[in-house]
């Protein structure tokens, strides 16, 4: 059966050809290898029609132009040569579009990313809409790749080399007005006249290339280029710690094109693309992409979710304010905050104001839109306005009696269908629901701080939570822009449970004479965004250590923190960044770079001896405990799958994405090797390193958690 065409050609009466992009049965337009023949057939027709004056590419999708290339194409490649051939095919197709003798214009609405932007760059001009959905970027680096269809060569010639490097090395996405300012697009217009403006542009001569700013012209020359690439290379190495080979290859390929010409540049681009596609880093990053896409499609349960029309929040603190913001401004739902103190409500409202006003200042949002979103948030010191709320999120202090009281008050003041979702990080949901009259409507909804930035939420049903309550809570989390994983109601849930032994071990090494900065640097070198000691300071030492006794009571000695260390720190009024002193001392509020290790921390915790561990030895001790605990969580069905375990660790605590998550990392090392490392560490440092039974069994049988493909579980 012949595949329906994703590209269709219609010639208007004014002899402008309209090529409509609409991938059949897909929400998003993505480029697939099999479309090449369709596009070539259209190009042949365009060349044969001598009456044509111009061409416009436009999408039929309501919210995307082309969201990128289909990543499965890369997964289907088994060798460097196959992946390189894929890139060369893309390059050739873009070259054929660019070589058309009449003006070719891309009319862009919605996401124009990756291969989509490379197609737009191959056109002679670009017009995009002023809609917030319209973004342009080359995010391939986030998959451990580089743009493989000419993007590394066309973009620097259009907008300059320094701006290009910033875009490609970070995967940064530009809004319409930013793209216009940089010269990436020729015009920004309302969606209603996009086609009309693109057609008018196609009737003119090819748009002449805009002269680059003086700074970009200097940086493109030999001296400026040498300085720029040295500086950017150094900065990139510091940021990636050498863990992401794609960044090094991007610099190499862009520089080759500028120094040796586009022919050499395209050749280098295709070769680098092929080699990067086969790296373990790219395979791991693509697995995270597939897993997160899969999680976002997971409804959480088989039951249909209940309608969600409005939400209530109990507690106007930092978490309550953040939850109100994502509920109103991301989910678009009316939200009412209850706090016993009017000041708490004011703080929560100010939180959303600050977030939105920042967007207005950066010109990412209109003032009218800010006001419209703020109008969705209201506050009260009692339960007025709560009767009809579909779901209440509780974000009060971590106190069981208080949370049980909140359940009783919600059941008394809200509708019979109202769901009660607790943002607890440590208390069992079953205990919170113990005295509820409708326990089936009580669930855990654990956000991470800062709420607006952290992508993960844990959804925690207790034994009596209904399937519909789970589905409805998952639905809300997705509307809030979060990636939800459903976890079992056991102490620490998943993320905090695997994080605690990792941080405990860092503190234990500190007491044996290792330096704060050495421990943190070792884990940053391993691939974490910050080290464990700094993480504790950022979260708040009082908040971050609260769960340790809960975990120790539930699981025993392996969760015990070094004796009296935590109490010594807290008794010295050290809470971390929030009060200016923890393991580090902090400068004025807002000056993030001004932090230094406080030498007084060592005598305070009774540190003894001189640190003798290398960076790999430090990271090995912390990470192995995390891996072991993650495997226990699978074994005890705390997480439903290793997919959820990998996503939870990467999105919840910043486990190095290029390793693919704890379970991908175990597979890459081999379960047997992990067992051998842990047995060695157990001999050296004690029984907390004893590998769990599941890991030992898998090592003996040579089993892995994932199949060889990026998307399937063993």
Curated annotation (Swiss-Prot):
Important for catalytic activity (site feature) positions: 118, 140
Annotated Gene3D superfamilies: 1.10.1040.50, 2-enoyl-CoA Hydratase, Chain A, domain 1, NAD(P)-binding Rossmann-like Domain
Annotated signal sequence range: none
Domain of life: Bacteria
One Gene Ontology term of the molecular function aspect: 3-hydroxybutyryl-CoA epimerase activity
Region spans: 3-hydroxyacyl-CoA dehydrogenase: 306-714
Example of a GO cellular component annotation carried by this entry: cytoplasm
A Pfam family the protein falls into: ECH_1
Compartments reported by the entry: Cytoplasm
Keyword Secreted recorded: no
GO biological process terms on file: fatty acid beta-oxidation
Protein function: Catalyzes the formation of a hydroxyacyl-CoA by addition of water on enoyl-CoA. Also exhibits 3-hydroxyacyl-CoA epimerase and 3-hydroxyacyl-CoA dehydrogenase activities.
Recorded family membership: In the N-terminal section; belongs to the enoyl-CoA hydratase/isomerase family. In the central section; belongs to the 3-hydroxyacyl-CoA dehydrogenase family.
UniProt-recorded name of the protein: Fatty acid oxidation complex subunit alpha
Lineage, opening ranks: Bacteria, Pseudomonadati, Pseudomonadota, Gammaproteobacteria, Enterobacterales
